[in-house]
């Protein structure tokens, strides 16, 4: 799906906001289900909806009407194009979509959690997980991977009473795990009391909840004293003994699950990733495709924090191990730092 907007009235900061609203718009259609984001989306159309006459063109009509209605102040006209030819979809993905996503992500390179005065909440996914609340910071984007701190800021400026609310960070409780009284109060209010406290930098202590739109799932791997990460595209087995869908079934739903967390791909290379447990040194396995995607930033972070060169070469993938025993052998051979760290449990 390609939504064309007027350049003169629609700013670059607003486009990701509109794009993420597709999730809500499509899920408002009876008999239609949407999940995912960016270039990893899934749309299901029920047999009843199809029998009633629903066709792909109607998705375009819904998007057109919804965008014109909600963003009428800045969008005076728009065009929705739906591509179904696989070759053309692949071309647009690589020539248009991915370069656009990369440009958006690059805007955050010089921002840190310490350099801003406020964070933002995001509850766009509460239609699926009523108790889930994302806390979006410069160094931890929304777990869907599509809502950065700048995107949340733009959403709030456009609609102060909308899905992204300002969260101040003036009353720290435990900066080691990233727990703030202001954040706890916001999460409790926005989750209707289902969640009382949350940390931003820990997978074991009060981890952030997840809905079902996460790009990746991170889970503790006790044999190697580290964590494994699986991305949505990966269909195989992990050393945790579970596939991505199996991990998703126990991680999503807006419930805190110590030892497991959903997150965006770009959070993997962050200096705040699992900071409370030792950071990215804990990463021992991820699918080869994901490892290649995050390699540059992850290697750079490992070099800056620990002086390790080519850290991703120490991380296992499905080509070397999908069971814990073989993984530990590989990590031992590579001298992975997680093997010498304190136990996580």
Annotate each predicted stretch with a short phrase.
Residues 1-345:
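Cysteine-centered metal-binding/redox modules
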């Amino acid at each position: 799906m390609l939504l064309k907007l007027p350049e003169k009235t629609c700013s670059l900061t607003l486009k990701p906001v509109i794009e993420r609203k597709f999730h809500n718009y499509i899920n408002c259609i009876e008999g239609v289900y949407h999940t995912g984001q960016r270039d990893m989306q899934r749309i299901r159309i029920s047999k009843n909806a199809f029998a009633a006459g629903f066709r792909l063109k109607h998705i375009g009509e819904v998007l057109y009407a919804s965008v014109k209605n909600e963003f009428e102040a800045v969008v005076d006209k728009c065009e929705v194009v739906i591509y179904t030819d696989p070759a053309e979809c692949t071309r647009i993905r690589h020539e248009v979509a991915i370069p656009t996503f990369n440009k958006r992500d690059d805007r955050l390179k010089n921002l840190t959690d310490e350099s801003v005065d406020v964070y933002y909440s995001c509850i766009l996914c509460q239609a699926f997980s009523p108790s889930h609340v994302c806390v979006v910071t410069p160094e931890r984007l929304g777990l869907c991977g599509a809502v950065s701190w700048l995107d949340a800021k733009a959403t709030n400026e456009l609609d102060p009473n909308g899905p992204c609310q300002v969260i101040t960070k003036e009353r720290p409780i435990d900066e080691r795990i990233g727990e703030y009284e202001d954040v706890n109060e916001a999460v409790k209010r926005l989750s209707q009391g289902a969640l009382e406290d949350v940390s931003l930098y820990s997978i074991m202590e009060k981890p952030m909840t997840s809905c079902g739109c996460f790009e990746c799932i991170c889970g503790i791997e006790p044999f190697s004293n580290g964590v494994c990460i699986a991305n949505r595209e990966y269909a195989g087995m992990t050393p945790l003994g579970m596939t991505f869908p199996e991990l998703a079934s126990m991680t999503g739903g807006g419930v805190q699950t110590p030892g497991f967390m959903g997150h965006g791909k770009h959070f993997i290379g962050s200096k705040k990733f699992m900071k409370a447990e030792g950071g990215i040194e804990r990463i021992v396995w991820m699918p080869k495709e994901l490892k290649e995607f995050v390699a540059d930033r992850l290697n750079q972070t490992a070099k800056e924090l620990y002086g390790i060169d080519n850290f991703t070469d120490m991380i296992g993938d499905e080509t070397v191990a999908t069971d814990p025993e073989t993984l530990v052998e590989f990590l031992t051979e590579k001298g992975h730092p997680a093997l010498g760290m304190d136990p996580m449990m």
